[in-house]
């Protein structure tokens, strides 16, 4: 039996009575953002809108992006990454559960020294994939060229954000590489592993 999104009380400053808001809206007011699903255009636009709004509201107070995602679409994910780099406040990234594929890319995109993984979190990197089987031959070639450009772009970002040599990142992206939190720290995707 689904219970929906839980509601919590929230009192606006200067108001006597609290109103009930869903838990995510309450957490957004504290600058805590959540990516708890596959990356697609809808969640990308929501997170971008929240980051821009909160940045305008207060450009000195940090944002916190909690990630538990199996990955998803590259272009919407890169849009989130670019926004993280663009907004004035530092964006902390926190991996809880899984940050795979585009999720790990966003995890690495947090402010350097402010990227964290919970102790039992898992991180996975790999190269971008496509649905070639649905394309005609001409489209297949164009899509392959675009995919190679995307792979090169993602690889360059991983190199910049992790400090690893290009050949190491390129080799790791050839296949699915799963890491524990401490392995992700050694790889430069996160800076800290949370402890009690």
Curated annotation (Swiss-Prot):
Keywords: Chloroplast, Hydrolase, Plastid, Protease, Serine protease. It catalyses: Hydrolysis of proteins to small peptides in the presence of ATP and magnesium. alpha-casein is the usual test substrate. In the absence of ATP, only oligopeptides shorter than five residues are hydrolyzed (such as succinyl-Leu-Tyr-|-NHMec, and Leu-Tyr-Leu-|-Tyr-Trp, in which cleavage of the -Tyr-|-Leu- and -Tyr-|-Trp bonds also occurs). It is found in: Plastid, Chloroplast stroma. Its EC number is 3.4.21.92. GO terms for molecular function: ATP-dependent peptidase activity; ATPase binding; serine-type endopeptidase activity. GO terms for cellular component: chloroplast stroma; endopeptidase Clp complex. Coiled coil: none annotated. One of its GO terms (biological process) is protein quality control for misfolded or incompletely synthesized proteins. The keyword Cell inner membrane does not apply. The active site is at residues 101, 126. InterPro entries: ClpP, ClpP/crotonase-like_dom_sf, ClpP/TepA, ClpP_His_AS, ClpP_Ser_AS. Its main location: plastid. PROSITE patterns: CLP_PROTEASE_HIS, CLP_PROTEASE_SER. Component of the chloroplastic Clp protease core complex. Cleaves peptides in various proteins in a process that requires ATP hydrolysis. Has a chymotrypsin-like activity. Plays a major role in the degradation of misfolded proteins. Belongs to the peptidase S14 family. This is ATP-dependent Clp protease proteolytic subunit. It comes from Gossypium hirsutum (Upland cotton). The gene is clpP.
């Amino acid at each position: 039996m689904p219970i929906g999104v839980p509601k919590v009380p929230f009192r606006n400053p200067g108001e006597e009575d609290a109103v009930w808001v869903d838990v995510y809206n309450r957490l957004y007011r504290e600058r805590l953002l959540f990516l708890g699903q596959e990356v697609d255009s809808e969640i990308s636009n929501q997170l971008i809108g929240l980051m821009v709004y909160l940045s305008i509201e207060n450009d000195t107070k940090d944002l916190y992006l909690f990630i538990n995602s199996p990955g998803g679409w590259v272009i919407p994910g890169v849009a989130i990454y670019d926004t993280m780099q663009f907004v004035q406040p530092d964006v902390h990234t926190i991996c809880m559960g899984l940050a795979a594929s585009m999720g790990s890319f966003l995890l690495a995109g947090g402010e350097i020294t402010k990227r964290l993984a919970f102790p039992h979190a898992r991180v996975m990197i790999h190269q971008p994939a496509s649905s070639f089987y649905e394309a005609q031959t001409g489209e297949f070639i164009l899509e392959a060229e675009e995919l190679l450009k995307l792979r090169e772009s993602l690889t360059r970002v991983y190199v910049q954000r992790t400090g690893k040599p290009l050949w190491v990142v390129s080799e790791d992206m050839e296949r699915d590489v799963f890491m524990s939190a401490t392995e992700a720290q050694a790889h430069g995707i996160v800076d800290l592993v949370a402890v009690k």
